[in-house]
């Protein structure tokens, strides 16, 4: 089984992935952030490095999905391939930070990959307001994230909401991060687990 977490930068995907993997004894697959050779450069000069970064993420997540589907284990994935293609790359293109030529090349590659993969069995979307995202980003203190702009997070949030509203590829669970603290409050985590159980076992 393939469970995936989706959400904006700072929504709490990695934290919830860890907690759910521990609870269910699922195998976690994390976003390839530390190994990404383009991330620091991208936040310094988005226009120069946007295409390279997005191709790196696309390749990384495509390989990840193939690994997940060939695994006998239940896997929980931190961020999906769809977020790159539906949110981050189109946003960079709309902001003038990725050329139309590069964006069309990227979309063509994604569309080919998309014919070879399956959607997650359950997608968990972490919905968070911009103030919550900023607070979480500041708390974790990743140096390369210091230059992320408020308007950038806002644009990403708008694209996330549009994508989630039209998502029909599989089961979907929405978690309102503004209203809970699953990291520090066991009751909030328990509530999420109950909702996941209902989805997995078809008890709506």
What is each stretch, according to the model?
Residues 22-60:
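Conserved substrate/cofactor phosphate-moiety recognition/catalytic segment
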Residues 5:
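Hydrophobic anchor at the beta1->P-loop junction of P-loop NTPases
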Residues 13:
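Conserved lysine of the Walker
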Residues 134-204:
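NTP-dependent small-molecule kinase module
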């Amino acid at each position: 089984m393939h469970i995936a977490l989706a959400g904006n930068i700072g929504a709490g995907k990695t934290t919830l992935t860890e907690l759910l993997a521990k609870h269910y004894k699922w195998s976690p697959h994390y976003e390839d952030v530390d190994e990404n050779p383009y991330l620091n450069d991208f936040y310094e000069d988005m226009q120069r490095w946007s295409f390279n970064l997005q191709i790196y993420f696309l390749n990384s997540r495509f390989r990840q999905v193939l690994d997940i589907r060939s695994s006998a284990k239940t896997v929980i994935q931190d961020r999906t391939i769809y977020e790159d293609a539906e949110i981050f790359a189109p946003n960079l293109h709309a902001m003038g930070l990725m050329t139309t030529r590069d964006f069309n090349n990227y979309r063509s590659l994604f569309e080919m990959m998309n014919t070879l993969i399956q959607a997650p069995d359950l997608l968990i979307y972490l919905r968070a307001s911009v103030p919550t995202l900023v607070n979480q980003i500041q708390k974790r203190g990743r140096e390369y994230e210091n230059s992320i702009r408020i308007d950038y997070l806002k644009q990403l949030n708008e694209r996330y909401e549009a994508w989630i509203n039209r998502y029909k590829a599989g089961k979907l669970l929405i978690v309102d991060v503004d209203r809970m603290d699953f990291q520090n409050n066991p009751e909030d985590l328990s509530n999420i687990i109950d909702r996941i159980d209902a989805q997995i076992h078809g008890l709506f």
